[in-house]
Amino acid sequence: VGSVMRPVTDSHKVSRAKLSYLIDATAAPICIIAPISSWAAAVSGFVEGEDGFSIFVRAIPYNYYALFTIAMMILITVWNFDYGPMAKYETNALKGDLFSDSKEEKDTQRTFENPNGRVLDLILPVLVLIVCCVLGMLYSGGFFSGVDFVSAFAGSDASVGLALGSIFALLLTILYYCLRRIMSFRECCDCLPYGFKAMVPAILILTFAWTLKAMTDSLGAADFVAGTISQAAGNLMALLPAIIFLIGAFLAFATGTSWGTFGILIPIVVAVFQNTDPQLMIISISACMAGAVCGDHCSPISDTTIMASAGAQCEHVTHVTTQLPYVITVAAVSFVTYLIAGFVRNVLIMLVIGFALMVATLYVIKQIAGNKQTA
């Protein structure tokens, strides 16, 4: 994304710090609410004794951090304002300084242009991938054996469905590129190892997360925490989603991995609420995912943060410091929303309240930032 969008944002005088934030904000926050993703498969695998994929889908409307991050990107773009350190970089970008760090651009990536390329050549493979993954998940759920659509999707094996969908989408994409003579079959095959290499870190993180989960399970951590909370929390159970959100955020920030946070917290959340309050369990699982993504989003040692700054060719420290006020703003609004959601558990009402808080918060910040600029 960074290599594709750099020429576009440079021509519109958008700073590299702003570009890196937009890349980072459209990475994990989008993946965590996308049913057709490896994140859905990972989260589903941490929910034992339950329909993991169904729980993931039901938790999407309660994932306030991801939803509010998207809303924030839209609002600061439409209202055309920035605050914190980002404001300085955007002001300098309008004057032609896209970096503001006294360092010249080091574009070490080679750019290849194909005169026969079209926009459809980029969009069509993505659409084919989505369709194939959906069909793969329906196949794993028994849809083509007579199971109805809803039951097949809810009972699907996300890992199998995504793997099948990816394989067929890859084959169709290679066939399409060869027929369009954009790339030869050999060139397509030469690109495959780079895709495999790109997934190695994610596979290692997931493997370590499963290992950590197995260790906590062997120690009986989930049962211990569940029993302790059930005895001590009492009427304060409604506050747990907000508390879980904070714990997940701090844990992911310290470790730099959201998937590892999933592996630790989700089994504990399921053990606490599974037999007592299923609705609060959904909200708490979503709070766990939201907190993990929040901490991962702003952690300087997170792989997504590092890749975002590298993709935008922005200094890593600059990216971390400029996006931190934005992350804290969304995290604060999400925390307040989870506090209310523990008592008001209606999906639509909470979405209205949450988005209203987000808009009001940004409006106040916009007014304060505007007053500082005119002062």
Where are these regions (language model features)?
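Core transmembrane alpha-helical segments of multi-pass membrane transporters/permeases
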Residues: 117-126, 131, 154-221, 238-250, ...
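Membrane-embedded alpha-helical segments of transport systems
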Residues: 19-43, 57-78, 120-124, 128, ...
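Transmembrane helix-loop junctions in multi-pass membrane proteins
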Residues: 45-50, 82, 134-147, 178-185, ...
